[in-house]
Amino acid sequence: MNELLATVAPGGAVLDLGCGAGTFLPDGASFAVVRVDLEPPGVHVANFVQADAAQLPFPASHFDAVFSNHSLEHFHDLAGALEEIGRVVKSSGSLYVSVPDSSTLTDWLYRWLARGGGHVNRFTSARDLASIIERTTKLKHVATRPLCTSFSFLNRRNRRARPPRRLWLFGGGTQTSLLLATYILRLLDRFLGTRLSFYGWALYFGNAPDRIDDGCWTNVCIRCGSGHPSDRLLRVLRFPPAYRCPACGTLNLFTDDKQ
């Protein structure tokens, strides 16, 4: 999503929709960020507005960019939410959407462990979803990037409440178990052509840079879930190949995107 953030002019306005405590950090940003969610995040969040995505309390054409990062699958009124996004974003603005593919192992695990996990909308085709969003928001679809999993939602360090008993079937959510699981799935995908580490898609609409990296980033942090292209990572170990996440510093096993 950093590609679209870079297009926002100084003094602009950005909407982080369905974000909880926030899906990105506007460090050093020269634009304003408004965070919106149906439920309060439980911690202080600057410029937080509690609202329904299908009834946004903002004037038309107010935002230069809208980010819906893993939130469309949670909206009960998906059509209404998309119409509202189209209303509040400028015609010259941009939109970033990321969603899970409900046919993947990762989304199945998420819904099984979390007893649905709030996923009321299921998506199985990036092309179909892009067409719906483009038609509703009037923003042109410019790129789609496949997303890999890190199982960060299984990480016991990310849980405040007691983890479900089912989690012990997957190593208890320890970082060691997640390191091994993600690395093995990446290798199976590479050598056997499976889709076990595939998670979903990131879709870009509207005013986007001329070149968006639409390749699959296989290095996704097991703690914070942020993805990074392999050619921008500094390996700290040769065997096993490993890097530290630039966002949170967690040690992850490294895979080459181009292999």
Task: Specify the residue positions occupied by each region the protein language model found.
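Flexible loop residues that form catalytic
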Residues: 22, 71, 147-149
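Helix-to-beta-strand junctions that scaffold the AdoMet/dcAdoMet cofactor pocket
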Residues: 9, 75-76, 89-91
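Short acidic capping loops at alpha-helix termini that bridge into adjacent secondary structure
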Residues: 61-62, 92
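Glycine-/small-residue-rich active-site loops that bind phosphorylated ligands and cofactors
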Residues: 54-55, 73, 87
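S-adenosyl-L-methionine-dependent methyltransferase catalytic module, highlighting the catalytic core
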Residues: 76-80, 84, 94-243, 250
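Short glycine-centered segments of the SAM/dcSAM-binding site in methyltransferase folds
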Residues: 13, 92-94
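Conserved N-terminal segment of class I S-adenosyl-L-methionine
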Residues: 1-59, 65-68, 82, 198-201, ...
